[in-house]
A protein has these predicted regions:
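Short, solvent-exposed alpha-helical surface patches in well-structured domains
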Residues: 104-107, 117, 137, 150
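Short clusters of hydrophobic/aromatic residues that line enzyme substrate/ligand-binding pockets
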Residues: 30, 73, 118, 130
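Sequence-specific dsDNA recognition surfaces
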Residues: 5-20, 24-61, 193-221
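Non-catalytic DNA-recognition/assembly elements of restriction-modification systems
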Residues: 1-19, 137-205, 215
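Internal, well-ordered alpha/beta segment that forms a basic, Gly-enriched binding/recognition surface
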Residues: 114
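A generic structural signal for well-ordered coil/turn residues at beta-strand boundaries
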Residues: 69, 83-86, 134, 207, ...
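A short glycine-rich beta-alpha junction/loop motif
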Residues: 81-88, 123-149
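A short beta-sheet element
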Residues: 58, 62-110, 221
């Protein structure tokens, strides 16, 4: 499988089309999360001037230039929306559409390695901001279009399996919660202290060193 290195700027074009005529209202406002999805903003948009808001159509890439290193980039596959003027919006140009699968490009952007590259390029900046010019300078290894489509199909299948697994876990959690609630209501109460003992074993003889030190986080890991 041959890879071709391309400069992204040769295959993308920026869009600055805004909502200057106020055609679109607050119901179409979205933002981009660090998880790479569009979401409705939490703030109250009433009274906000929507004229500078950028119009986003199907096929657009939208990213936050100050949070791209955290994964704040999304690919628009749904209908039209509008985003803050602070976001950068771009599309594949005609040349890009011929050789780049947009979903493959989005998968590339979502990689941790890409986030690290953004961080590296921003290093030393007083106010780290990944401009469209910076995005254009990105060089990516690109497999043939058919191979990109295969990667996308495998990736989407893995996501579907993961979501199915997560739904199964939620169903199992509901069953367990119901079972525990039934026990709480019907089983006789007993003191937990009758079944547990404290452990105060201390590393006096230094059998264990720094590599053995562990803590407990909020996820109980």
């Amino acid at each position: 499988m041959g890879l071709t290195k391309i400069r992204l700027g040769d295959y993308i074009e920026r869009s600055t089309v805004n909502n200057k005529n106020l055609v679109y209202g607050t119901d179409l406002i979205v933002g981009v999360t660090n998880e790479g999805v569009f979401s409705t903003p939490k703030g109250n948009p009433i009274g906000v001037d929507l004229r500078p808001y950028k119009i986003v159509n199907h096929g657009a890439f939208v990213y936050n230039p100050t949070r791209l290193d955290l994964g704040s980039i999304a690919y628009r596959e749904d209908g039209l929306c509008i985003v803050s003027h602070l976001y950068i919006v771009f599309y594949l140009n005609e040349a890009g559409k011929k050789i780049i699968d947009p979903q493959y490009l989005f998968i590339y952007f979502r990689r941790k390695e890409f986030c690290r590259e953004v961080t590296f390029r921003n290093f030393g900046s007083q106010r780290p901001e990944f401009s469209f010019s910076d995005m254009c300078d990105i060089v990516i290894p690109l497999p043939p279009y058919a191979v990109q489509q295969k990667y996308v199909a495998v990736y989407n299948a893995m996501l579907a399996n993961q979501k199915s697994y997560e739904r199964g876990l939620e169903d199992l959690k509901l069953v367990c919660d119901a079972y525990i609630e039934n026990i709480r209501e019907n089983a006789p109460l007993q003191k937990l202290g009758d079944y547990i003992t404290p452990c105060e074993n201390i590393n006096f003889d230094l059998t264990y060193g720094v590599p053995d030190v562990r803590g407990v986080n909020n996820q109980k890991d």
